Structures are given as C-alpha cells and as structure tokens.
C-alpha cells in the first residue's frame, strides 16, 4: 500500500504474543505495539482523529491555532499532524518536559508555551490548563484539543485499536490490562471489546502518586501514566480492578521487556508489564490458558535519560530504599552474551 502522507500510516500496528517474558505456560499475553506509529506513540490516533474530524465538521478552520496542554506524546503527534495540515500548533508545557521531547517538538515546528508555577497538587497540570484557558480568551482563532474531556479521545481508540484487535485476535481475551492517564485509551478499547467479549475483565494500571483512583498525590517522574487531576472522561465503574505501579518497578520491568522480548518501550509499558506479573501471580495455574491483552504506548528512545539511564534508576531505587543497589539491572547487563555494548 502506498500512503499519500505519513498521516495515513497511523494505525494497523502489529499484535505480538509475548512468549519469553512471563514464564507461564498457562498464560498467553498479547501486546499491541502502538509505539510503531509514525510519531512514536498511541497518541497519533487521537491527534489525527480529533484534528481531521474538526476540519471536516468545521470546528477547526484553515487559520485555527491548535493548542494542547501536553509535554509529551500527544503534543508530538499534534505537531506532526498540524504541520502537514498547514495549522499552527502550540504545546503548553512545564519544566518537567524532557530535553528530548522539547527538541522533537521544535523540529516539528511547534510553538512552545512553558509555565513555571506549580499548582495546588505540587505539579503543573492545573497551571498548564489555566494557561490554555488564558490563550483561548486572548486568541479568537484558538482551538483547545482538551484530551482530558474530549469524547473524541476515547472514540479514536474505539474505532482504532479496538477494531484492529478484533480482526487480529482469533479468540477472546480474558483480561485487558492498560495504563490509565486521560482514560481515553482504556475506555475506547474496553467499550468496543466488551461488546464482542462481555466477560472480559478490565484492569487499569495507575502510577503510585497519581490521584486518578483516590490515592494521595505524590512525586512521580514517569510521564504517560497517572495524572495529578481526575479527567472528565474517566468512568471508574467501567474498570474492574486497579493496580498501582511505582517508577522503579515500571523502569525495571521495561528493562526486562527489552532483554527478553527485544521491545524497546517507554515507562508506561513497563508499568503494564509489572501489572500483568501481578495478575498472573494472583491467578492459579489452569489447564486453559489465561489470555491477557495489553498495549505498549510509546518508544524507549524517549526515555534514555530516565528508564534506560543507570544513574537515574539508582537515584529512584535509593528514594524507594531498594536494599541491594549493587544488584540493579544495568543497561549493560541486559545485552545478550556475545553482543558487544
């Protein structure tokens, strides 16, 4: 197939069975590799869906200024898509944005609006959103994507990954394990799959320190999972179980995923791997394989200064009081025998 632009290559990502990672003969784990989307993440889908639907229906015009509060994957996806559509795009970011993401956004030609004041939760999300609202008041042509409240967010996953999974997976999944942040991904996929597989259990994976499911706010470093405010889209009663994963556990699971499956994924992927390990630990051995479905949202290259940096992991481990720092899984220790660093 020949695409007319890079935008048309979004989606149709592979579904891969993880045969080496979990060591359970009575479990089949399948991961949809959203990290293979052209701008590097699952956020390519809502970015395309929301912008194209807005252009078609008139909510976005040829001279619109698209704005979003995002320091990461959605901002990058919007920068790529808006650039190709001839639209101006500005990402409202905060001091926690990684140098890599900032460089990527600038390469795509995005405008950068950075806030510096912390909000009442000690983070920056509310401050960023207030800056977006200020820009909307000041600029008549400004359009806010608003991923936390926009139903087009979850619709993009309902018509996107969920439809593809139904075509890719021959047998129903017993358990869906997905990270939660805006909640668009988990709701869009679960709502579509449950129509076909009504007995499927949905496990949401949240970050320790996130307030999504009633925990107190704490410092956390990995983006892409959890939030410091509850999104308007979140329907807690549609999620059967929630597992909280801390930064250290997510990072070490990322390293196991890379070592055993060769999948170089971002921090939230490690969180879902760690959550699946907990699900399997709590599941008795059975003659019928437990079929688990998950999704890896983004690429590991954006986490070279965190998840895959040994000094960063040691700092996180010390904060968590890991007893044996000398036994930390370094990047070098993950390289298979016979392969040079």
Curated annotation (Swiss-Prot):
Q: Which GO terms describe its molecular function?
A: transferase activity, transferring alkyl or aryl (other than methyl) groups
User: Any keyword Metal-binding?
Assistant: no
What are the UniProt keywords, alphabetically? Pyridoxal phosphate, Transferase
Mark the residues carrying the PTM N6-(pyridoxal phosphate)lysine. Answer: 43
Q: Would I find Transmembrane among this entry's keywords?
A: no
Required cofactor(s):
pyridoxal 5'-phosphate
**Quaternary form?**
Homodimer.
The protein's name is: N-(2-amino-2-carboxyethyl)-L-glutamate synthase
Source organism = Cupriavidus metallidurans (strain ATCC 43123 / DSM 2839 / NBRC 102507 / CH34)
